[in-house]
């Protein structure tokens, strides 16, 4: 492995700079955040162009809009939201409005987090987002703990966090940086993923002030560099976005004793680690009385959750869950098939994608390759209890399975769908439930 002294020096500089970050007044931290969006805008065209070239997207393709949305707009949006909250704290207000924190009928606390501004309402009219707080935490505790880092009298000492960056979406790594600096109060070393390390120079420009003041370092290399940094004594904590295999390699090791360590819960890593590892995400369609326009619109919705970023998303839809008793199920599948078939082609760019597509489709009856190549596939009528790869292994590419579950009523179907998602599908990162307003109103207790 090259550049071990440089890696050691980077971590030493972060360790030395950490107290300065902790002592920086909130007003100054906000000012540093406010300087980021103009820097993002400054490099946005070149950053988007670099990403589209790396992903094999033609300069005339409509897919280019994706980069501007998920890798640039989301970046700026997250920063502006953070600024909004911190300015409220600076002014002596609670981080969120009191009426945004409320308790549901079952006693669980819910926080309304989007829209937060008039701009949000204008841009994404009709959309809303909530955070559901862990059961047992009261509304009063939720309000008291919000932005606790900036409202406590005795803040904890900052740690050096190693961020092992995501290779699929650059904005994940960028927001991990914001999370560590501003939400957790840590300084951080970011090991860029080799798949998208071309974004590193842009981030070095955007975060240049944080780097120059010793609060952030961007580092490059493969698994050997990541392993060295993870076990370095000057790294206190780790956050990883990647595969379960990468997590296992970091925590349990890769030698012939790794399986034994895992079986006996003797991790090789002796420090806290958090991770987002993806999984098999369901798209559950609650049966209802849908029009032809409804079917087409929701088919486009389903296809989008599968095809965005060529399917290289940790929370991409992998299994479409339908009621076997719904008369419109076949029509919805036909619409999904048509949308995916007619979508503009784009190559899978993530390493190993072709092998994962092959593995997911191998031996599966009803596999249809769509769009004229083998990069997109629909597997209809997957047996929910077959243990098929599409149900247990994250594909991270353009394969969509369809499972039909019994349920003559909405309540019966939802019970079966939730049980299937929780007990059969691997992981718990995300799920989508789509239900038409009339059916939802009629089955509010379901």
Where are these regions (language model features)?
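N-terminal Rossmann-like NAD(P)+-binding subdomain of aldehyde/semialdehyde dehydrogenases
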Residues: 1-145, 180, 192-194, 206, ...
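PLP-dependent aminotransferase-like
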Residues: 160, 172-224
